[in-house]
């Protein structure tokens, strides 16, 4: 019996090397080898530190924003859910991995039964006792064709994908907090600008109204001045509402209220961000967690094909135990009371109405779907980086042009005001200068906000936002396979 068990174990070990998982090959990236070139793009420059390895504390210069990001990483609910999902998939992997090994259990039992006389072979009533103690394996599947190992591989890749999903969630959170913060700052600047402009309009309106009372200004001039005041009041209410809504958005992202001891923010036009290098398109394949997540899911689908293939072959399960059996507890472990059970079972699929073939087809289709998703993720990443690179140069030029436009409108406003005060030009010219200056100043703040959010999105598109400090990438080890 011992030789038979040994032979079976050796055979299972030899066949255990059999795997029906298809050889995995990473699909070709469906994007160009270089970033787009043209007048809208600046020449790409190399750097010692890739964007994905640049710490967010080095990228964001505003101490208030750094404080908000740190708060969000502690309290944000989406990030908490992503971390819990990671723990859940790790547990699922450990559960599946445990099927590779036999589950050994020890059992002990005892029973006493009274047998009536008419049921006894001796014709007399009596009491029978039975006690047992066994150690054994129950329904352990010998993984001859790799079905269990395929499922374990699938669970591992799913777990690894959840780790990358958590990284993606954090990177997206850092960018979202930054964009929400800059929007809040911009709306505050617009609100302050509108408040100052409204005061100017009201002063002009009161002056025009007094001029009308003495016959210098016409009723039309008064009406035009009032129109400017009411228009500014509309903007005042609008920006007041937006500032309040910006605070609400930030509160959700932070997972708590804005800290009362928030550091003093930088001015919106200050040096807010460090420049990030674009690198090569091939770099994002290794640095974007969403791409790595998609590839892990593709590998998981590939492993499922191995499990579907293995279902066509016989499966062998083994139940075995050894122990002792005695009618007397005191002699349970005495010599001669030994007992054993060896119960192999083989299951050979013969007819299943095509379900196994359909299951294999389904697993192959799922792999093709994941290939398409993987390629789409790469294409989306390429587009996001390309858009960010195009925005970088054009926003610099646009902002400079807008600053020049504001300066020109300030000159126009000063001249128009002077000419209106001394009676050379009408009130219409002066009001037009006021409106043009107000519009140009609003546009400058809006363009600056668009530039900042574009740079933040480029940092995110390049995989930045995972590390707090530059240099941590070399200190942190890659994700380890969890131990069972």
Swiss-Prot record:
Organism: Pseudomonas putida (strain DOT-T1E)
Cystine crosslinks: none
Subcellular location, record wording: Cell outer membrane
Topological category with respect to the lipid bilayer: Lipid-anchor
Record protein name field: Toluene efflux pump outer membrane protein TtgC
Gene name as annotated: ttgC
GO cellular component assignments: cell outer membrane
Inducing stimuli: The ttgABC operon is repressed by toluene; this is mediated by TtgR. The ttgABC operon is induced in response to chloramphenicol and tetracycline.
Family membership: Belongs to the outer membrane factor (OMF) (TC 1.B.17) family.
NCBIfam families recorded: outer_NodT (TIGR01845)
One of the GO biological process terms: response to antibiotic
Lineage: Bacteria, Pseudomonadati, Pseudomonadota, Gammaproteobacteria, Pseudomonadales
Lipid attachment points (S-diacylglycerol cysteine): 18
GO MF term (any one): efflux transmembrane transporter activity
């Amino acid at each position: 019996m011992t030789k038979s068990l040994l032979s079976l174990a050796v055979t299972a070990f030899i066949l255990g090397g059999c795997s029906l998982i298809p050889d995995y090959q990473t699909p070709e990236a469906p994007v160009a080898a270089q970033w787009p070139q043209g007048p809208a793009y600046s020449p790409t420059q190399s750097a010692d530190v890739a964007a994905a390895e640049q710490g967010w504390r080095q990228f964001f210069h505003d101490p208030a924003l750094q404080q908000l990001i740190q708060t969000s990483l502690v309290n944000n609910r989406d990030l908490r859910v992503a971390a819990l999902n990671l723990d859940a998939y790790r547990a699922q992997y450990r559960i599946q991995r445990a099927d590779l090994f036999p589950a050994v259990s020890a059992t002990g039992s005892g029973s006493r039964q009274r047998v009536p006389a008419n049921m006894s072979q001796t014709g007399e009533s009596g009491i029978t006792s039975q006690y047992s103690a066994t150690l054994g394996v129950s329904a352990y599947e010998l993984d001859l064709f790799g079905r269990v190992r395929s499922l374990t591989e699938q669970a591992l890749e799913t777990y690894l994908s959840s780790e990358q999903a958590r990284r993606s969630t954090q990177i997206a959170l850092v960018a979202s907090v930054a964009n929400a913060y800059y929007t809040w700052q911009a709306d505050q600047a617009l609100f302050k600008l509108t408040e100052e402009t409204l005061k100017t309009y009201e002063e002009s309106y009161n002056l025009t109204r007094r001029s009308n009372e003495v016959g210098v200004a016409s009723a039309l001039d008064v009406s035009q001045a009032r129109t400017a005041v009411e228009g500014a009041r509309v903007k005042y209410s609008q920006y007041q509402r937006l500032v309040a809504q910006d605070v609400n958005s930030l509160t959700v992202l932070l997972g708590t209220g804005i800290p009362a001891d928030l550091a003093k923010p930088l001015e919106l036009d200050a040096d807010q961000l460090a420049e990030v290098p674009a690198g090569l398109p091939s770099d994002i394949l290794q640095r974007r967690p969403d791409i790595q997540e998609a590839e892990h899911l593709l590998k998981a689908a590939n492993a499922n094909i191995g499990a579907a293939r293995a279902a066509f072959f016989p499966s062998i399960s083994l139940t075995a135990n050894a122990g002792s059996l005695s009618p007397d507890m005191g002699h349970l472990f005495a010599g001669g009371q030994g007992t054993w059970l060896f119960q192999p079972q083989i299951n050979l699929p013969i007819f299943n109405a095509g379900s196994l073939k359909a299951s294999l087809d389904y697993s192959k289709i799922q792999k093709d779907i994941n290939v398409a998703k993987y390629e789409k993720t790469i294409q989306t990443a390429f587009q996001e980086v390309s858009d960010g690179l195009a925005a970088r140069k054009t926003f610099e030029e646009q902002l400079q042009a807008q600053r020049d436009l504001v300066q020109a409108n300030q000159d126009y406003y000063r001249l128009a005001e002077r000419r209106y005060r001394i009676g050379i030009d009408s009130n219409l010219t002066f009001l037009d200068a006021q409106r043009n200056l107000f519009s140009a100043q609003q546009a400058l703040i809006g363009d600056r906000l668009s530039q900042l959010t574009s740079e933040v999105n480029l940092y995110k598109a390049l995989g930045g936002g995972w590390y707090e400090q530059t240099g941590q990438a070399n200190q942190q080890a890659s994700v380890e396979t969890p131990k069972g």
